[in-house]
């Protein structure tokens, strides 16, 4: 494979191929997800579903040793909505249609019949959920209602790359309807924090979290909270977002509920989502020149156990069976393979596929463990393995985060002067700085430096000067080029 540090683009393309992650679709910006990538996406779905399920599920045994995902105090029910809607529906919310118009896939003809009202392939589902809820009856007693769907969406993109920017991609989108704005906003923040938990604590991806600027927030949102990560090339990648929608959609679509005063009132809504773009973040953050490197919590196969016994030694087989039983007791996702030849080839493919630990039993006394992160092979007796394996997994998890954080720290500059900022941009790095955030500044950043304000991390408590305008700064922000 190409060297990741020297040619990230070529390295990424080769990784997708060698790890058998995607096959390119016939239409630009579409991909066929192969088992290795889709199973990874299913594990991320599991994390989210477990935290939001009606019956809160808990990971078994070994996974409890990590920081667990804190289940949300909300009931989220799974639904599936249509892909098609009418273009006229999008025109009911001006900011929404203006924000999405350049990206919409429109169907203007069916067979030989031209459509008076074109159909839209779903770019997002705020409108579809409003139309669903409009057909239902609500009172303050049965609100909130929160629905989630795992689906695909369509947005026309000029420059496409698998996982990072696609014309068709997969995501989950959660939509909630509330009787008041305070609780709707609180839910948006709670789901945003859940994304932080998944991305940072489970996927080991360092992140910057905060509010989107008014120009970068979701079309129609009152506020958008984001989780941004910095990739090895210094570009930011938006990993997940959550939106306080207020009454932006519920009002024009005529949604009402019966309040405690027995009157009809307009409800409030929020939405949030994480997409297969997170797979791109995971690949770029952790993988190396030898292939995939996967976080323990989402690796579809966490351990591969090889029995390599050409002599048919009974005690070697018994040791392998003992290791198999141990892995079952620890509720680990593992694969047991009896190998008669070409063990090296099997281990090499396991390395490319990012298996966190490969265990080799080829004698009655020891188990060899190959650690994917460190690429070191170590021999353990069964007793040592049984007593230390949980610790090894914990070390793997922490070392993965620490390694990723060290790379991010090299790609982000804390700056106080315009000279420092411009030098960072020239070096293709992201910038943390205090600014007076205005439309003029955001336009200047795009036109002059080809960067954007990725998120506002906090409002300043102490006086600082904006290096761009010389005026009093108000926000501490992350500025970067973006995928």
Swiss-Prot record:
<dbReference type="InterPro" id="IPR045864">
    <property type="entry name" value="aa-tRNA-synth_II/BPL/LPL"/>
</dbReference>
<dbReference type="GO" id="GO:0005524">
    <property type="term" value="F:ATP binding"/>
</dbReference>
<dbReference type="GO" id="GO:0006433">
    <property type="term" value="P:prolyl-tRNA aminoacylation"/>
</dbReference>
<dbReference type="Pfam" id="PF03129">
    <property type="entry name" value="HGTP_anticodon"/>
</dbReference>
<keyword id="KW-0067">ATP-binding</keyword>
<dbReference type="Pfam" id="PF09180">
    <property type="entry name" value="ProRS-C_1"/>
</dbReference>
<keyword id="KW-0547">Nucleotide-binding</keyword>
<dbReference type="InterPro" id="IPR002316">
    <property type="entry name" value="Pro-tRNA-ligase_IIa"/>
</dbReference>
<dbReference type="GO" id="GO:0005737">
    <property type="term" value="C:cytoplasm"/>
</dbReference>
<comment type="subunit">
    <text>Homodimer.</text>
</comment>
<dbReference type="GO" id="GO:0017101">
    <property type="term" value="C:aminoacyl-tRNA synthetase multienzyme complex"/>
</dbReference>
<comment type="similarity">
    <text>Belongs to the class-II aminoacyl-tRNA synthetase family. ProS type 3 subfamily.</text>
</comment>
<dbReference type="InterPro" id="IPR004499">
    <property type="entry name" value="Pro-tRNA-ligase_IIa_arc-type"/>
</dbReference>
<dbReference type="GO" id="GO:0004827">
    <property type="term" value="F:proline-tRNA ligase activity"/>
</dbReference>
<keyword id="KW-0436">Ligase</keyword>
<comment type="function">
    <text>Catalyzes the attachment of proline to tRNA(Pro) in a two-step reaction: proline is first activated by ATP to form Pro-AMP and then transferred to the acceptor end of tRNA(Pro).</text>
</comment>
<keyword id="KW-0963">Cytoplasm</keyword>
<dbReference type="InterPro" id="IPR017449">
    <property type="entry name" value="Pro-tRNA_synth_II"/>
</dbReference>
<dbReference type="InterPro" id="IPR036621">
    <property type="entry name" value="Anticodon-bd_dom_sf"/>
</dbReference>
<dbReference type="InterPro" id="IPR006195">
    <property type="entry name" value="aa-tRNA-synth_II"/>
</dbReference>
<dbReference type="Pfam" id="PF00587">
    <property type="entry name" value="tRNA-synt_2b"/>
</dbReference>
<dbReference type="InterPro" id="IPR004154">
    <property type="entry name" value="Anticodon-bd"/>
</dbReference>
<keyword id="KW-0030">Aminoacyl-tRNA synthetase</keyword>
<protein>
    <recommendedName>
        <fullName>Proline--tRNA ligase</fullName>
        <ecNumber>6.1.1.15</ecNumber>
    </recommendedName>
</protein>
<dbReference type="InterPro" id="IPR002314">
    <property type="entry name" value="aa-tRNA-synt_IIb"/>
</dbReference>
<dbReference type="InterPro" id="IPR016061">
    <property type="entry name" value="Pro-tRNA_ligase_II_C"/>
</dbReference>
<keyword id="KW-0648">Protein biosynthesis</keyword>
């Amino acid at each position: 494979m190409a060297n990741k540090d020297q040619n990230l683009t070529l390295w990424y393309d080769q990784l997708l191929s060698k790890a058998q992650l995607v096959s390119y679709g016939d239409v630009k910006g579409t991909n066929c997800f192969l088992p290795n990538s889709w199973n990874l996406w299913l594990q991320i779905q599991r994390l989210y579903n477990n935290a939001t399920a009606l019956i809160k599920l808990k990971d078994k045994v070994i996974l409890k040793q990590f920081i667990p995902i804190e289940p949300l105090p909300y009931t989220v029910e799974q639904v599936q909505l249509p892909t098609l809607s009418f273009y006229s529906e999008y025109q009911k919310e001006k900011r929404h249609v203006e924000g999405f118009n350049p990206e919409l896939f429109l169907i203007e003809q069916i067979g030989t019949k031209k459509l008076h009202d074109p159909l839209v392939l779903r770019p997002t589902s705020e409108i579809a959920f409003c139309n669903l809820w409009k057909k239902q009856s609500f009172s303050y007693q049965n609100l909130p209602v929160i629905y989630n769907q795992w689906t695909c969406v369509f947005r026309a993109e000029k420059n496409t790359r698998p996982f990072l920017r696609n014309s068709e991609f997969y995501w989950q989108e959660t939509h909630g309807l509330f009787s008041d704005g305070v609780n709707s906003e609180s839910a948006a923040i709670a789901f945003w924090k859940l994304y932080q938990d998944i991305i940072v604590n489970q996927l080991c991806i360092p992140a910057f979290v905060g509010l989107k600027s008014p120009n970068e927030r979701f079309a129609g949102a009152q506020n958008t909270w984001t989780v941004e990560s910095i990739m090895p090339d210094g570009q930011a990648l938006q990993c997940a977002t959550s939106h306080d929608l207020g009454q932006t959609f519920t009002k024009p679509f005529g949604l009402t509920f019966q309040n405690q005063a027995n009157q009809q009132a307009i409800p409030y809504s929020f939405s949030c989502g994480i997409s297969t773009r997170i797979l791109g973040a995971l690949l770029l953050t952790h993988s190396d020149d030898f292939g995939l490197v996967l976080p323990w919590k989402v690796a579809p196969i966490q351990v591969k156990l090889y029995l390599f016994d050409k002599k048919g030694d009974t005690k070697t087989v018994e040791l392998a069976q003992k290791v198999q039983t141990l892995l079952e007791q620890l509720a680990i996702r593992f694969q047991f393979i009896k190998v008669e030849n070409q063990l090296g080839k099997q281990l090499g493919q396991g390395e490319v596929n990012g298996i966190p630990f490969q265990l080799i039993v080829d004698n009655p006394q020891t188990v060899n463990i190959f650690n994917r992160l460190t690429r070191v092979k170590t021999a353990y007796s069964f007793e040592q393995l049984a007593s230390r394996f949980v610790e090894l997994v914990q070390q793997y998890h922490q070392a993965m985060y620490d390694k990723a954080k060290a790379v991010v720290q090299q790609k982000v500059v804390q700056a106080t002067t315009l000279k420092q900022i411009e030098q960072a941009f020239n070096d293709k790095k992201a910038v943390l700085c205090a600014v007076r955030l205005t439309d003029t500044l955001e336009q200047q950043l795009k036109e002059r430096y080809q960067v954007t304000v990725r998120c506002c991390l906090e409002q300043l408590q102490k006086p600082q000067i904006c290096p761009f305008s010389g005026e009093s700064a108000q926000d501490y922000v992350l500025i970067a080029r973006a995928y």
